Each structure stands twice: as structure tokens, then as C-alpha cells.
Amino acid sequence: MRRRLLVAVLVALASAVRAQQEVPEPREYRMDNYRAPVPAALSGARVITTEDAETIWRDKQGVFIDVLPRPPKPQNLPEGTVWRDKPRFNIPGSLWLPDTGYGKLAAASEDYFRQGLARASGGNSAVLLVIYCQENCWMSWNAAKRAMSYGYTNVAWFPEGTEGWERALLPMEESQPAPRPGDGKASPQ
């Protein structure tokens, strides 16, 4: 009798802990605390695992979009200071559209994201877009939700991102952000 009671209590406690860890899917974009546990779902999108992402990547079934932010060069650096951007290693062949996963985007960032998705998809709103960042990063959740709001109908959200990819010992490559309009740099893709 005591053993059954103990088992029942332990099961109830485990269920309570799991319930606390589950993050509900919000209706709106996440506006702050972007590095935090994410929900298990995104309405309208397919949520994929690292195994799913690897299959899509190997079979060239979709376009991979990395939305990890990139810190800007500080404006107040002393003259002569050499600035080196931190390298970004992501899934080979990805288009890196930094700073496009914030909850609210400036008009220029929104245009940059729209243009990047249009270029990546070849203007086809049914092309599979695999959107990712890092694990426990709301940037990818926001960006995938935003892509659907633009009319993209085949969006996959990869919440494990580059950390899940790297844990699976899959190849990574150093990447540069897609150029923003007017920055004068050649497009990486």
C-alpha cells in the first residue's frame, strides 16, 4: 500500500515538473528574453527535429534560413581599433538573415527579411523554408511566424538550431550575413 502511494506521489510530482517546463504557444511575437525555453509548437508551421532537418538538408528539399542576430560594430570605438565580427558557423548552404527574429522589426529589417525570403525561395511561397537560430531561441520562432504572415505556406521551424545540429556531429560552415540593401557587399548566395 505504501509503495503504491509513493509511486503515485512520484508520478504526480514528475507530471507537475513536466507541466512547469512546457511553454505555452503565445498568440503574438515574443518581444523580449529571446534566449529562454520555447514552446513545442508553432501554429501553421511544421516543427522539426535535428533528424528531420538533416534529411531535408541532405535531400535538398528546402531552404535553410538562419536568423541569429549579429552584434553591430560599436559606434564609440577609439580611432584605429580593429573590429572583428564574431564568426558564425551554421548549416551549410544557409542564408543568414541576422536580426530578423525580434518581436518588432524596424521597416528596414522587415524589408531585408522579406527580400531575403523572396530571394531564397525564388519567389515561390510554397518552397520549404527551414527557419532556425540556436536552441531555446525565440528569434527563430518569431521569424517562422513572420514568414507565414508574409504568405509562405511551407514553413518548418527547427528549434534545436545549430546547437542540435552540432550535437549530431553534422557539418557546419562559417557564414556571412546576407548583405543589406545599400551596404555594397556581394551576396553570399
In which residue ranges do the predicted regions lie?
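Surface-exposed acidic loop/strand-edge motifs in secreted or periplasmic proteins
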Residues: V67-P71, N76
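Bacterial N-terminal signal peptides that target proteins for export
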Residues: M1-L6
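Short hydrophobic beta-strand that contains or immediately precedes a catalytic carboxylate
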Residues: A53, V63-L68
